[in-house]
Amino acid sequence: MEVNTYLNAIILVLVVTIIAVISTSLVRTEPCVIKITGESITVLACKLDAETIKAIADLKPLSVERLSFH
């Protein structure tokens, strides 16, 4: 009887491991992209917490007048 319980425990661990591997491989995460052009700022697939929102709010589109080339 102990061998049967041991085998059941091993099978349970294997099934749980396989389910975990499959579920994590199905979840795809997109990289956070912040695109700044001369006309707009676009935020794609970013996790927006208070700090990120504050940082994005301070951004401005690029303009040649504000760029300096030294």
Swiss-Prot record:
Q: Please list every transmembrane segment annotated in the UniProt record, as residue ranges.
A: 5-27
Keyword Transcription belongs to the record:
no
**Residue ranges, Lumenal side:** 1-4
Q: Which stretches face the Cytoplasmic side?
A: 28-70
Checking InterPro entries in the record gives:
TGBp3 (IPR003411)
Q: Which UniProt keywords apply?
A: Host endoplasmic reticulum, Host membrane, Membrane, Transmembrane, Transmembrane helix, Transport, Viral movement protein
* A Pfam family hit: TGBp3
A cellular component term (GO) from this record? host cell endoplasmic reticulum membrane
Q: Where is this protein localized, as stated in its record?
A: Host endoplasmic reticulum membrane
Which coarse location class describes where this protein primarily resides? host cell
Which GO biological-process labels does this protein carry? transport of virus in host, cell to cell
Asked if Cell membrane is a keyword of the record, the answer is no
What does the function comment of this entry state?
Answer: Plays a role in viral cell-to-cell propagation, by facilitating genome transport to neighboring plant cells through plasmosdesmata. May induce the formation of granular vesicles derived from the endoplasmic reticulum, which align on actin filaments.
Q: Which family does it belong to?
A: Belongs to the Tymovirales TGBp3 protein family.
Tell me what else is known: TGBp1, TGBp2 and TGBp3 seem to act together for cell-to-cell propagation. TGBp1 is the main movement protein that physically cross the plasmodesma with the viral genome. TGBp2 and TGBp3 would facilitate TGBp1 function.
Recorded protein name is Movement protein TGBp3
